[in-house]
Amino acid sequence: RAVKRLSAITLLLLGFFDPCLADKPNILFIAVDDLRPELNSYGATHIQSPNIDRLAAQGVQFNNAHVQQAICMASRASLLTGYRPEYHNIYSGESVGDLLPNALTINKHFERNGYQLAAYGKIYHYKSDHVAQFGGRWSDGSTELFDNGRYATQDSLDKLELNRRDPVRPHEDRGPAYESADVEDGAYSDGYNTARAIETLRQFKLSNEPFFLAVGFRKPHLPFNAPEKYWEMYPPGSIKPAEIREAPRFSNQYTLRDPGELRNYYGMPKHKGESVDLETELTLRRGYYACVSYVDALVGKLLDELDSLGLAENTVVILWGDHGYKLGDYDNWNKWTNLSIDTRVPLIVRAPGLEGGLQSDALVELVDIYPTLADLSGLEIPQHVQGTSFVPLLRKPDLEWKKMIFTLWPHYRDKFDQTVTGFSVKTEKYNYVEWTRLATGEVLATELYDAVDDPAETINVVSLPGNDEAVSEMKILLEAGWQKAIPIVR
């Protein structure tokens, strides 16, 4: 032992030994479904999110983080495998296990490097992927809970049964679009899973091995179900409707998708083109906000437990949303576009030894998370990973970084149809989209939004006078691809 210690000291003096790598940090990996960057720390003062705000005050908040594709499984597939959509070929209902059975996912990479694994809730999309990735170390809800922690009242289950027999749009598994129930946090699966995750943290504390604990919150995804006390944080009279009511001017047939997701729920408009009334819109928005505050409280419980166990000082905490969401914006209730309201997400990282309370406006992508966490942990970044570690931004948030980032969206018609896909390149100034017929390469439509002068993306200016040069430049960037966006760190 004395020889080993002397060797370490000698290496340290010679500059070859990094003591930080001798004690790998733990990872608390927090995924939140359908979470918009509509949090107090992001400037949304109407939202009560004190615990996520606390995390931001202790870490680095990214204000310009975007997903690769604005739908649950495809977005998560890029983050968890390190592959971009064009390479993993997951666009909607496919699973990682079906298309990438041998992929070295982020959790597998950490496991191979000596990390203990555990996961609760929604990390991937399908149960089969969770079981394949985590085995018996994953769980989601419990049969001990009413309705397995989805709905909390019999009234909601009665409405679910009515919805199964709806004459216009029946759905086997959708009840009301929202629920306010006088129950404890643990009555819903998110609260139950948080309690289980806390138990696991206590078990991990007894071990000398680092851990990778993934906690995936299903809220604020539809249905907007949360304990009543979180609804009460938002009095009905305080809720405002969406500011942008119409589709972007000069948009095309591919820009938006009909809001079929909301129509699946009981009591919601069932016909295409039918909008929700104002009262329903305000109730839905209130329910979404309640769910955000519910998840925020659960995040707070996890952070508090890290503190009480003495684990916070050696744990990387990362919180991310898998895509944005339209709460009546553009008269839509879904994600599923290349518009920034759907691709932009909250991303916050707190890492040991790094300054907190910082914000970065740099362009980053969720595919960058895999290499970043590997980098922070002193692990090799696998060669297949197509993202870029943004650890330099954690140290210097205003560092010159990526000039552009990339998203895509395969167009839906009556059923999923990949023959026409919208490829988007985003810079600090513009969001440019080309809708391309994949079989021929023909560009059918284009869009250009000015992110500086029109951050809500209300006008497609691609054909307006004075934008020819911008269109040409953005087209070149799109064709150059993500490899040309890798920053050079000096």
Language-model-detected regions and their locations in the chain:
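Residues forming the ATP-binding cleft of Hanks-type serine/threonine protein kinase domains
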Residues: 452
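N-terminal secretory signal peptides that target proteins for export/translocation
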Residues: 1-3
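Sec-dependent N-terminal signal peptides
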Residues: 6-16
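Formylglycine-dependent sulfatase
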Residues: 21-435, 440-444, 455-486, 490
